[in-house]
Amino acid sequence: MIDNHYVQSSAKALSQIAFEEKKEKLFLNQLFIIKNIFSYNPEVVEYLASGSIKLENKKKFIEEIFDLIEPLILNFLLMAVEDNKIKYLDNIFLKAILTINKKLNIENGIIYTTLKLSDKKLLEIEKKLSVFLKKEVKLLNLIDKELISGYEIQVGDFKQRNNVASWIDQMALSIKKGD
């Protein structure tokens, strides 16, 4: 069960610190990187949430992995380990990212793919969408095992599908029209 109050207050605190320290972009980038590390490496979260691992070992692990991270974010990670709240970090970071982006007037979106996109490809798609939508766009790449091929993008009210399901839908529509 997610502790919504803890998630909301922690995300708010992180985003407020980012603005107070005038490090919004740095926080955005680093929170996004850490979120992806945890998302794509669930064994890291399991290790840090384990009751059989000593707290000192968990802290040392965090300090070694994230030694180049902004100290304020590192302290937040260490506090989450101390308070046994690691399992909430994914939601906290997502909400903090969304809050910072909203204040910076950046539109958040999601691109669903069958495989993880490279950072270069994701940036290329973000740039094209930013030009098309006439606003800065930041995409989160999520893996959708139900997609057979292609992608789905959602940014606000804008949706684009280019996958096997959309091709089949188009063929069915074409057949119904008698084309």
Swiss-Prot record:
A Pfam family per the record: OSCP
Tree of life domain: Bacteria
Residue runs in coiled coils: none
SUPFAM superfamilies documented for this protein: N-terminal domain of the delta subunit of the F1F0-ATP synthase
Membrane disposition: Peripheral membrane protein
InterPro entries attached to this UniProt entry: ATP_synth_OSCP/delta_N_sf, ATPase_OSCP/d_CS, ATPase_OSCP/dsu
Chief location category: membrane
GO CC terms: plasma membrane; proton-transporting ATP synthase complex
UniProt keyword Cell membrane present: yes
Location in or out of the cell: Cell membrane
GO molecular function: proton-transporting ATP synthase activity, rotational mechanism
UniProt keyword annotations, A-Z: ATP synthesis, Cell membrane, CF(1), Hydrogen ion transport, Ion transport, Membrane, Transport
Gene3D superfamilies tied to this protein: N-terminal domain of the delta subunit of the F1F0-ATP synthase (1.10.520.20)
Family to which this protein belongs: Belongs to the ATPase delta chain family.
Role of this protein: F(1)F(0) ATP synthase produces ATP from ADP in the presence of a proton or sodium gradient. F-type ATPases consist of two structural domains, F(1) containing the extramembraneous catalytic core and F(0) containing the membrane proton channel, linked together by a central stalk and a peripheral stalk. During catalysis, ATP synthesis in the catalytic domain of F(1) is coupled via a rotary mechanism of the central stalk subunits to proton translocation.
Subunit structure comment from the entry: F-type ATPases have 2 components, F(1) - the catalytic core - and F(0) - the membrane proton channel. F(1) has five subunits: alpha(3), beta(3), gamma(1), delta(1), epsilon(1). F(0) has three main subunits: a(1), b(2) and c(10-14). The alpha and beta chains form an alternating ring which encloses part of the gamma chain. F(1) is attached to F(0) by a central stalk formed by the gamma and epsilon chains, while a peripheral stalk is formed by the delta and b chains.
HAMAP family recorded: ATP_synth_delta_bact
Record-given protein name: ATP synthase subunit delta
Organism the protein comes from: Mycoplasmopsis pulmonis (strain UAB CTIP) (Mycoplasma pulmonis)
